[in-house]
Curated annotation (Swiss-Prot):
UniProt-recorded name of the protein: Proline--tRNA ligase
EC class name: ligase
Pfam family of the protein (one): HGTP_anticodon
One GO-annotated biological process of the protein: prolyl-tRNA aminoacylation
Domain description: Consists of three domains: the N-terminal catalytic domain, the anticodon-binding domain and the C-terminal extension.
């Protein structure tokens, strides 16, 4: 029993030290390991399999809307990166540069892509001539490099995996519609597959993406009450097209500039899953995204027939679910603890007494509820358990979010909430960046978004300066 206890004790309590808890979970659940390059990490099979499931399901949702996948080079010539002034200034501190190829010094530095707007713009400028060529709706799955000073696994790293979509359209209306459509796809995906509710809204001008006319965001609330920007969608208007000469002839044979969008999510979503659903025993994965949905654990497996029956059960379940069996010689208690640390959605226990009764025991990872089911009906019952678990995890996360949104009507109330109540603060804002800066300086709280669905005028004046205000903003401390 000491070994099982040690396995679980290796994870710090989240109430004691949330930061250390997170670090312990990503290591003990075998999601990642540190590499010899600071800020870069190794995805282990458990971690990469989660990303594969995110990629598979999100990619299918993209393609339903006409998105096509492409792949762009990793390197961007410096002259190309500098074509859009605001964009390059926004990324300059984080860009990694290649200055030498083999034994030769390069005539022009090459940026290791921090994002690929400029490459897509170059492509669009060559391939778009007529209104018949539009829209172009492209996406790529790749890694990008941003030389971060402070890094944390899955949340902020010097190299990370993501998808970046880039589109060009004939009209501003079409571009805006695509920008919002992709944000809605992200939010729907996170609810349906990750069991994470999102606050959707528009970023303030201070927080928007460099070079964008408008940035829309999905914001999730972590267990410690901090916000996590989990996906963004940008409307670039005709700024990039003008810088890169992306034009088309319309139906009247007149030359017009295109309107452009970009949108992306990254492996940061794995960090969100960990911090929304995890507990002191480790990872808790929603069944729809879990690499392994059920672990079969034989009890007293040394007894005649137990292992054979456990393998038969695994084969039967494998027709409908993602299944593994733990037939190692470790104790059942150790196996239970290992399954819980790794966040496997359920386990099925089967031993000699169960076999006599033609039954097995399903145990949910999130609640540890035990359900005795007939072996004849195990597939049907497990499907019900997994569906219920997925729904329960979403409802629990929704309840947590709703209970951690507080309204502030004046600045003293705002500061008191920021100091004592984790979560989002709803407050009115006049639109002046000076107030936004003051709030951040005084409280470390930043504007997260101006929400789409929530337009309640909770006050007539700005929470900071007291001037007339018409913009409701969600504020919060954030990763």
């Amino acid at each position: 029993m000491a070994k099982e206890k040690k396995l679980v004790e290796a994870i710090t309590s989240m109430e004691e030290d949330f930061t250390q808890w997170y670090t312990d979970v990503v290591k003990k659940a075998e999601l990642m390991d540190y590499s010899s390059v600071k800020g870069c990490m190794i995805f282990k099979p458990n971690g990469y399999a989660i990303w594969e499931n995110i990629q598979k399901n999100l990619d299918a949702m993209f393609k339903e809307t006409g998105v096509e996948n492409v792949y762009m080079p990793m390197f961007i010539p410096e002259s190309l990166l500098q074509k859009e002034k605001d964009h390059v200034e926004g990324f300059a501190p984080e860009v990694a540069w290649v200055t030498q190829g083999g034994l030769e010094t390069l005539q022009e530095r090459l940026a290791v892509r921090p994002t690929s707007e400029t490459l897509f713009c170059e492509l669009f400028s060559k391939t778009v001539q007529s209104h018949r060529d539009l829209p172009k709706v492209y996406n790529q799955w790749c890694s990008v490099v941003r030389w971060e000073k402070t890094t944390r696994p899955f949340l902020r790293s010097s190299e990370f995996l993501w998808q970046e979509g880039h589109t060009v359209h004939a009209t501003a209306e079409e571009a805006e519609a695509r920008t919002v459509q992709m944000l809605n796809i992200y939010a729907d995906f996170c609810e349906k597959y990750l069991a994470i509710p999102m606050v959707k809204g528009r970023k303030t001008d201070k927080e928007k993406f460099a070079g964008a006319e408008a940035t829309y965001t999905i914001e999730a609330l972590m267990h410690d009450g901090k916000a996590l920007q989990s996906g963004t969608s940008h409307n670039f208007g005709d700024g990039f097209p003008k810088a890169f000469g992306i034009q088309y002839t319309d139906k009247d044979n007149k030359l017009q500039y295109c309107h452009e969008t970009s949108w992306g999510v990254s492996t940061r979503l794995i960090g969100a899953i960990i911090m929304v659903h995890g507990d002191d025993s480790g990872l808790v994965l929603p069944p729809k995204i879990a690499p392994t949905q059920v672990m079969v654990i034989p009890i007293q497996q040394q007894k005649d027939g137990v292992l054979d029956k456990a393998y038969d059960l695994k084969d039967k379940l494998s027709k409908d679910f993602r299944v593994k069996i733990d037939a190692t010689d470790k104790t059942p208690g150790w196996k239970f603890a290992a399954q819980e640390v790794q966040g496997i959605s359920t386990r099925i226990e089967i031993g000699p007494k169960d076999i006599e009764k033609n039954q097995c025991v399903i145990v949910r990872r999130d609640t540890r509820e035990k359900i005795v089911v007939s072996l004849d009906e195990v597939n049907e019952k497990l499907a019900e358990v997994l569906e219920t678990m997925q729904n329960d995890m979403l409802e629990k996360a929704k309840a947590f979010l709703a209970s951690h949104i507080n309204d502030a009507h004046d600045y003293n109330e705002f500061k008191a909430i920021a100091e004592t109540k984790p979560g989002f603060i709803r407050a009115m804002w006049c639109g002046d960046e000076a107030c936004e800066n003051k709030i951040k300086e005084d409280t470390t709280v930043t504007s997260r978004c101006m929400p789409f669905g929530d337009q309640e005028q909770i006050s007539d004046v700005c929470v900071c300066c007291g001037k007339p205000a018409h913009k409701l903003v969600y504020w919060g401390k954030a990763y």
